[in-house]
């Protein structure tokens, strides 16, 4: 690989060990595995009507027609989990009930995608702005602070970060990167760099920053009292962003990236460590971050909560509240208390 940054010419590429990684795409005959046969649209309905796989949905003739059209454009495998997310599996629910849960999940995905996108853009902006102003050196310009090994927790994390950044810029098709490469001799200001980094790269960059720099950035953006929690909140936001980008499920999901929460919040909202993998806690983390965003975005978040409450109220018989970590006070916990800016 040819590295983008001139200061990085002598970096040794970090090679990931492959021996212990599982091998996917195995041929079924080679491993004695029986593969399922493809099903027809009508057979999807038959499966959903039966009890063998825990679906047990009822279908009217109209619902059969709706379902056949639906499965022409939506993967049955993706939908098949939703009947199992209805509150009581002993009860007989309709296809419409399961479809409504599916639609609620789509609503959640759209909203969460919007807000995590706002968070991603904001974090990138704040990192570029504050680090370039905090940084002081006689060796590197403020705009290229990320090139300084002293900015990182170790030489190893510095080298790995430079490799990651260099790869991102080499893959870029953006004219402004080409401009800086050809017209600026490859000198990239941090506010240009962050535009080409993924949320994951920025998240990782923050995690390997020298503690003093990271704390100064965090204190300026979120306040000193949140210093211990911010990185985990951002990691959760990044995780939720990825879920939405891949059109994966939010409703009834057990999340695998868990946040650090304030003890007083956990006590006030009745959250236990066992609840940290729920939708409610995921939304609580987004609310915690967005409480430091603009008044406009905070208002949009509260409107999201109003709409979510209306959806829950209209579908209370099919919403599985415990599965998603929601308690009676869920809305008050997730609303942002908006404090107008004093212009005096």
Please place each PLM-identified region on the residue numbering.
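Extended intrinsically disordered or low-complexity regions, especially N/C-terminal cytosolic tails and loops
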Residues: 1-239, 251-344
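Acidic/aromatic/glycine-rich contiguous surface patches that form carbohydrate-binding/processing clefts
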Residues: 247
